[in-house]
Amino acid sequence: MEKLREESEMAFIHPIVILLAILSGVYTGYLGWKRFQFRRGHGSASDFPWQKHIQWGKRFYILLWIGCFIGVGGLFYMKGEIFTSGFHAYLAVLILLLFSIGVTLGGNLSKGKGTNRLALIHMVINYSAFVFVLIQMGLGVIFLTFFL
């Protein structure tokens, strides 16, 4: 009975951390959208809070990895395996890969090594990864509802 209680508690820590990551990622994307608007002639350069975008992006990425490790650790603790959640786990790997590429490109941009084209690629990769995040959220709700 004690193990079952631990399993259900652990199962809710992962989605809470991931939800915090998603909220900070959406805010980071909103800040990045301001830059995109400026480059298209809408607004001034001062409208884009560069440092704030970088800080929130770092928070998002760190929370995303923490959430991933909690999810993987919880699965390993409960089941003794990692990829028992099937498509949810594989989609998580794709999401982490896409955001890792986006963060790497963002790092190059923050060091002044990028072009407008690189900034656009950075934005497209990160925004498209959020499509997979929406699918992942649906899968997570299914897991919490039917499998725990």
Predicted regions and their residues:
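Membrane-embedded alpha-helical bundles that constitute the cytochrome b-like, heme-associated redox core
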Residues: 1-148
